[in-house]
Every structure is written in structure tokens, then in C-alpha cells.
């Protein structure tokens, strides 16, 4: 969770954690429970259908803004920072009502509509990717992603029997799950260990093999990253964390719905920079797995380093609150 990693950096700079308030939903709360900060849980309305969703549910939007403003108005808020495009319009309005500076972190190559609209109010937009599109370029500062720095490349060790991690994002991926099923039926699977994050509410695969373990969801990604040598997954904003750790990725970008704009562009960026490979078929997947595996054995698996934004973003926010 980017905000958790950012809070840790702010604390290192000298920020009193009691001066930080996080507005989140139930899903985000569980990631922040071990931090000594104020957390306000809300079911604030956020549109997943663009501007139309906000227009059709305008009363819900107003209620959410009033609710959050009521909680924050006596807390002397000087900075509002958001990492989520869906909630960005509410955060933008709240910043105006509280007379606070507003910052956005854009986690994809192609900015979502929520961040694009909210950028009108933002002082700055911190981008994870270079050349971020669909947003006010004059306000964009390329910082790199916010990642978990408790792990570094030195902590990612090559296993005697290489391990492939399959993950389809927080909600899982039917396509990736299907590829796992096919892979476990192939002769190739015996050469690897498999860690599969199937996603909640996804159909569990009936795989009985000593080299296969499956999870609905993983809360501590550190454990997952330390287990794997190759990552097969989507191309969301989190793919930059694997790049930071030097884990080669096989990318299967989602091409439908709200992620259809940014995931293919994210994947192309990662491939162009040498952090991963895009595949479109199961056959392509097996070819790339073999290529990467042979690269490990020949010592040709070093990935280029990636710039991260933890410190740069934290310093900018810290300067505004001291």
C-alpha cells in the first residue's frame, strides 16, 4: 500500500504520526493497523464509471464530502494527498474546503479520469512512470513509484529450484488462473515450484502437487517476493515494486474495463525498459519462462535499477506541514 510506505518515510523525516490522518475504507484499514496514526473509515462514494457515475450519484458524492469534511475540519489539515484515482475528486474538493494544498500520486502511465479531473486543483502530480499521459503535464513531477523499501535486491536470492509466482492483482485473474492450470498439466511444471495467488471469489483450481501452493490473497508481499524468482502477473502500478526488487516479470496486461487504458501502456513501458516481457498466449508464456530460467543459469538475469519516489515525495509533503 503506497500510503503505508510513505508514512514510514515521513516518520523518518521527523513527522509526528499524530499529525497524520488517513481516510480509508475497510479494505485499506487492515494494512494500516500497526501504524500509530489516526484512521477514519468511510464508505465514501467513488465512481468506477467515470463522470457519468458521479453525475448519476451526485447526492452520494455530496454526502461523502460533507462526512469527511466534518471529521477533518478541526484537525488543522494543511496537505491532502491521494494515491487513488477513484477517490481523487472527493479529495480534491476536501482540499479546497479545508484550504489545504492538494497532491496526487499517479501510479500508471495513463492517468485515470478521476486523477485527470482532480489535477485542475492539484499543486503537483507525482508520477510513477516517465511520460505520464492523460493528465496536466505541467504539474507532473516524475519521482518513480512509492515502494516497500524493507526489502532490497540483496534480499531476493535465487532458489536452487526456481519458483514462479503467478498473481492476478487484488481481485485475481481468470486468464492467469487458466494459464496456471495449463502450466501444471504441462511437463515444464516439474522443473519449478509454483506460488499462485488466485484472488478472492475466484474458482479454486483442483491441483494436487507437491510443488504447488495457492492463496486467495497475500497481505505481506515481502514473503511472496522472497519466495519467487519469476513473476507472472498483470501490469498494474504494483508491477514497479517487482522491478525495484529486480524480479523479472512476464506481463499479461488486462485489456478490458477500467484498466484497459493503462495496463497495456504500463506493460509496454516495463518491456521497453527491460523489466519484463509481454505475452499474449500460453505458448508465449512457456517460451519466456524457459528464456528467463536459462538466463538465471547463465548469470544473465540482472535487471536495470529503477528510481523510486519514497524520499522525494515525502520531502515535498514534509516541507508543507512543518
Question: Which role fits each region the language model picked out?
Answer:
Residues 1-197, 201-322:
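Nucleotide-activated sugar donor-binding and catalytic core shared by glycosyltransferases
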Amino acid at each position: 500500500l503506497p500510503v503505508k510506505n510513505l508514512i514510514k518515510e515521513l516518520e523518518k523525516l521527523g513527522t509526528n504520526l499524530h499529525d497524520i490522518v488517513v481516510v480509508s475504507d475497510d479494505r485499506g484499514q487492515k494494512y494500516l493497523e500497526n501504524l500509530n496514526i489516526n484512521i477514519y473509515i468511510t464508505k465514501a462514494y467513488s465512481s468506477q464509471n467515470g463522470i457519468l457515475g458521479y453525475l448519476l450519484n451526485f447526492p452520494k458524492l455530496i454526502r461523502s464530502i460533507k462526512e469527511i469534511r466534518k471529521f477533518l475540519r478541526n484537525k488543522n489539515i494543511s496537505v491532502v494527498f491521494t494515491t487513488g484515482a477513484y477517490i481523487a475528486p472527493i479529495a480534491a474538493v476536501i482540499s479546497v474546503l479545508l484550504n489545504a494544498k492538494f497532491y496526487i500520486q499517479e501510479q500508471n502511465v495513463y492517468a485515470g479520469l478521476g486523477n485527470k479531473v482532480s489535477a485542475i486543483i492539484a499543486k503537483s502530480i507525482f508520477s510513477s512512470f516517465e511520460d505520464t499521459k492523460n493528465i496536466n503535464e505541467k504539474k507532473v513531477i516524475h519521482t518513480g513509484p512509492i515502494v516497500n523499501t524493507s526489502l532490497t535486491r540483496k534480499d531476493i536470492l535465487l532458489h536452487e529450484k526456481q519458483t514462479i509466482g503467478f498473481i492476478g492483482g487484488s481481485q485475481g485473474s481468470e486468464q492467469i488462473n487458466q494459464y496456471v492450470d495449463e502450466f501444471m498439466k504441462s511437463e515444464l511444471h516439474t522443473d519449478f515450484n509454483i506460488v499462485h495467488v488466485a484472488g478472492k471469489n475466484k474458482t479454486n483450481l483442483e491441483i494436487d502437487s507437491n510443488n504447488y501452493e495457492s492463496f486467495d490473497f497475500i497481505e505481506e508481499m515481502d514473503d511472496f517476493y522472497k519466495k519467487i524468482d519469476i513473476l507472472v502477473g498483470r501490469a498494474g502500478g504494483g508491477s514497479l515494486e517487482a522491478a525495484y526488487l529486480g524480479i523479472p516479470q512476464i506481463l499479461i496486461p488486462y485489456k478490458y474495463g477500467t484498466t484497459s487504458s493503462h495496463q497495456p501502456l504500463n506493460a509496454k513501458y516495463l518491456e521497453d525498459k527491460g523489466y519484463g516481457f509481454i505475452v499474449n498466449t500460453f505458448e508465449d508464456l512457456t517460451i519466456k519462462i524457459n528464456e528467463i530460467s536459462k538466463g538465471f543459469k547463465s548469470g544473465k538475469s540482472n535487471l536495470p535499477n529503477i528510481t523510486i519516489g519514497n524520499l522525494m515525495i515525502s520531502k515535498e509533503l514534509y516541507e508543507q506541514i512543518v
